[in-house]
Amino acid sequence: MAYRHFERFCNGKCKFGELTIKLGERYMMYLTTQARAMKPRYERLGTNTAAAYFAVFKKVLRIAYQERMIRENLADRLGGIPKREKRKEFLTLEEVKQLAATPCQYDVLKRAALFSCLTGLRISDILKLRWEEIERASDGGWWMRICTEKTETEATLPISDEALELCGEVHGEGVVFAGLRRCMIQHPLHAWIKAAGIRKHITFHCFRHTFATLQIALGTDIYTVSKMLTHRSVKTTQIYADLVNSKKRESANRISLR
């Protein structure tokens, strides 16, 4: 995706000899002011998304310099796009149960959302999850062997019996959540959440946050949660531990003798 945005920026034509600091700065400006998401609504790129794409561009510049394709180390001279600290919204266990008890316009959307709450999988990985990637373990349980779309990380992750039930009838091949579409995670998802009486701003990705915070709150160690989320560094997972600790502090302060 980062490549496609640079391709748009330079109209599909850019030679190594044309890479300069000025071009890099123009590309940074393009990402933050003009670039549009490829889908689903072609909205302007978010700040953090633009920052991630520009970081990929700088990585390519660094490799090009190391391979002597360009003479100057442009990556070290270019600045970066500052990321914004975003609030990670998540559901409590009670709210997840409320959702599970609330009818949804699309059953496949409901099953996929609850599956994300129980596994931490991103929407991109749920959409492409296939029955060929789910197999029975020697202990009688189930595993899924996936390659994540965002980070291209290969992982073998356990699936609980409840999560497997959400997949529907077990098949030998094909897409697990057949009929699930990205357009469903907009209005249909928000309508379902509202019908459940939940007033938080919840996106599909919040179900991944929900999985992480609930696991930590219920005692799973941070290193295990990090592996389950396929994070490359436990520092990324630490954010969820901080969220849980913040909630604990809030609850502790609710009881007062004054």
Task: Give the label of every model feature segment.
Residues 18, 77-80, 86-89, 93-94, ...:
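Conserved tyrosine-mediated DNA breakage-rejoining catalytic core shared by Y-recombinases
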Residues 2-25, 33-76, 122-124, 191:
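N-terminal DNA-binding recognition helix of tyrosine site-specific recombinases/integrases
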Residues 43-47, 51-53, 66, 70-123, ...:
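Basic, Lys/Arg- and aromatic-enriched nucleic-acid-binding interface segment
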Residues 133-140, 199-200, 220-239, 246, ...:
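Short, polar N-cap/turn motifs at the start of nucleic acid-interacting alpha helices
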Residues 160-199:
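Active-site/catalytic core of tyrosine-dependent DNA strand-transfer enzymes
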Residues 90, 148-152, 182, 229-254:
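Catalytic-site neighborhood detector that most strongly recognizes the C-terminal catalytic loop/helix
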Residues 98, 155-158, 169, 242-258:
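DNA/chromatin major-groove-contacting recognition/catalytic segments
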Residues 66, 114, 118, 125, ...:
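C-terminal catalytic core of tyrosine-transesterase DNA break-rejoin enzymes
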